Amino acid sequence: MSAASFGPGCSSCSKGSGASAGPGKTTPGMKIDIPRARAAYVTNNASDSISVIDLDGDRVVEVPLDLEPDAHEAPHHLAIDAATSSVFVALAFPPETKKTKDPHGGHGNAADVGRLARLDLATLAVKETRDVDENPGDVVLTHDRKRVLVTHFDMKRAMDVAAKGGASPSTMFAQLVIFDAKDMKRLGARPVCVAPHGVVTTKDDRVAYVACYGSDELVVVDLASDGFPTSRIPLGAMQGVPGVPRFGPYSATLSPDEKIVVVANLEGQDVRVLDRATKRFLPDKTVPLSAKAFMPAFLDDRTLLVPLQSPDGLARVDLENAKIEARASFPRDQCILPHVVRVANDGRVYLVCEGDHRAPGSVLEIDRASLAPKKRWAVGAYPDGMAFGTE
């Protein structure tokens, strides 16, 4: 059931910050003999690499993203434009991991600036990079493939401001940064909220929805207007204080019919539904999950697959009736720490599992009906993002 894996091991071991990994650095990449039409690309946060998996076979090719041998690049999420053979990857340069019970203890705590890297899809060679702010979170392409959006999950900023005391919560805000996808020119930036992470755009690319982990809100960004004006929608009546969330929204997912936005919450351990027409969350549509909800995907307009942690698992949720239709757990030798679900154009479903952040993580193909694993690929350490070669 497990596919073969080729490539480097944990290249992040004993690595330092990204201070020496200058913006002019590139990497050679390597030959990838998996056709793009059947390939998926997975960022490996702990092993500084991208795994390419053959969705119709067993092959896995792991390509290093080492800009500098002593830097821990920590690729975190990616977006693909197959038409221009481009891959955009956020490089986080996190601090050295300390012994902690929290497997994500280093996430959002970097002191060094991050980077947005553009790679060649054919070889995964790094062609160019641009500085972003500390702790880049999500990276997405607009549907017209003209702009790249980068959020910043900067909990360190929030904690530093809180420790000083007396400052306005707005000084904790991290930015949404927008680049031209063609030439990597920075088009603008806007402070949006405390520790923004998941972002999704409407099909017309006029609006972005940003999940704001550190301030318990969903921010709506007007991408069509100068300055990218924002409006804010709290997730509930009893938000946590800035930097200490009660709900902890991690991702925002737009339904295929674009009528609702689903926000998945870590601390709140639920999914919440925003009605786009009224710009209000619907309390009767909230679905408690009794586990941390990460980055889900829609199967249809009202059916959602949600990856869960603490306890680990996967839930299929009927949003129309606000209930869990099915729930599955996995043996630890198959999947540890489910992070993101992706649904391919052919309807096949994939689940990325972080693993223990040291040994290889995994990608599972999931049966839509039973939620049972159909196939497994071993990838690099701490995988946390996935995109398809035909996007």
State what each model feature region is.
Residues 10-391:
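Predominantly soluble domains enriched in secretory-pathway, periplasmic, or organellar proteins
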Residues 1-8:
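Sec-dependent bacterial lipoprotein signal peptides
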